[in-house]
Amino acid sequence: MNYKGVIIFGPWCGEFSYELSWWNPGIRKLRNEDFKDYRAVHIGYKGRRAMYKDFIDDYVSYPKEIEDTLSYPAAGGQHIIDVGEVIPENLKEFMYKVAGEYQDKGHEVTLYQADPNAYNGGKHIYDEEPFGDYVNYEVNSEMYDEIKKEVEEYFSDGRDTIALMARIRDRNRGENTGGCYLNWNPDSWEVFLDKVINELDTNIVVINLSTSGAAGGAMSFEGTELYENNKERIMTINFDDDEDSLDRQLALLKATKCSIYGASGSAVLPFFIKTPTFTQQTVEEGFRLRYKWERDLTDDLKNIKIFDKYRSGEDVYNSSPDELFDEFKEFYRSLV
């Protein structure tokens, strides 16, 4: 194909949920409408190309030495204390380097740079229908088959399997909140999951993501009493340091009965492949999972349960694991 030129989007260095929910759909629309005759390139985090496959030709990941400098993603950029959200200079330099490589091949290059302040003051994130093209993702069939086989061989007992993303983030957001105002007490997670495993007679596949720094991640529970008492019923898959991390997460979500997500914006990920999911949210955040664009992706939130009874901070941190289990049990038993 003869391209008019090359359009490079990025460098994206903000939060995963903002990328998934607003940045990605926004540039999909721009690419398909304004740059449809261009070769499209995206610069961003390693492992996330799955959400760009339908409209980006070349996905360029940050090399490790650059990604290691990114420790505080916030909204659309990296947060600097007393400054706000920014795109660090080393990322801009990397973008120019990538652009130069295309120019050296004779291409005319256009840059569409991420705006770290694009979401300040709630812009876009509170819109029922934000600017963008929202699509359901296709799950990689080979990865689906691999993950499904891996899970079935690990358990080999015929029980339903549930994917788990037990969200945790290490930020100083209150002395009684475990480091972040959206965290849930780790002891409560253990009580809740023990009930999910033993009272509902299920297996759990834990999505393990690094919890280092402020970027957030997911607990693995390895070494806990929960894990020691239920080793044969808990499988952990580490999704760090993997070029296909997001593809593999999507495959896992598709290969399991349903998923459980802690209070995180990434709880919308199952929406993009229409798989059943239950998420613990807060009063201040839960309503953001019920906008029109989310209802459209999920056939009006079919097989989606958002439990958002408690307020952020100590309220949700100290909330009852028994109550959450009762809510999940009702949801789980409603699935056909």
Residue spans for each PLM region:
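Active-site regions of enzymes building and remodeling cell-envelope glycoconjugates
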Residues: A50-S71, G77-I80, S220-D240, T275-T277, ...
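A short, glycine/small-residue-rich beta-strand->loop->alpha-helix junction that serves as a flexible
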Residues: W12-W22, D170-N185
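A nucleotide-sugar donor-handling region in carbohydrate enzymes
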Residues: G84-N172, F331
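Nucleotide-sugar donor-binding patch of glycosyltransferase catalytic domains
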Residues: A267-V336
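Structural motif
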Residues: G5-I8, T161, C258
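Acidic donor-binding loop of glycosyltransferase active sites
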Residues: K254-I260
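Active-site and donor-binding regions of nucleotide-sugar-utilizing enzymes
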Residues: G5-D104, Y112-A114, R248-A251, S266-L269, ...
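Catalytic donor nucleotide-activated moiety binding site of glycosyltransferases and closely related
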Residues: Y45, R159, L164-N176, P186-S245
